[in-house]
Amino acid sequence: MKRREIAREEWQHFFDSFSGQHMGWLVGVDRFDEFLDESVQMRHLDGALRGVQSDADEVALAVDDRSSGHLATESIRDPQRIVLEQSEDEVDTALEIDGPQSCIILRFRDPMPAEMVDGIAV
């Protein structure tokens, strides 16, 4: 696996492209929150990706939650780092969004090259 950090000045363009390319793909989302007592809370979500948005203060992703049937949103305030994980064939496999005390890891359930899904309704 290859990991590539996305430069902050590229975040807006990256997320616009990423959302368009991967909208509707099945994902697993893990969120980790660290508290002052050093305990860590973890939440998991499965569903279809609906988009990722970024502004100066926050990165948010929206997923159709399979368990509840509702749109769920996870966000990181004051994001510090965005890392894209890819296979050796440069297929996107995961996205990591790191904040001061929180982290979201989005993993694709069935990663495949984007050109293989062009024109397929998801």
Predicted region positions:
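Helix-rich interaction surfaces within compact, conserved domain-sized segments
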Residues: 74-122
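N-terminal helix-cap/turn-to-beta initiation motif at the start of protein domains
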Residues: 15, 19-20
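Short coil-to-beta-strand transition motifs
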Residues: 36-46, 75-77
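A short, Trp-centered hydrophobic/proline-enriched beta-strand micro-motif
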Residues: 22-32
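Charged, alpha-helical interface segments at or near domain boundaries
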Residues: 1-14
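Short secondary-structure capping/turn segments at boundaries of alpha-helices and beta-strands
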Residues: 14, 33-35, 48
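Amphipathic protein-protein interaction modules
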Residues: 48-93
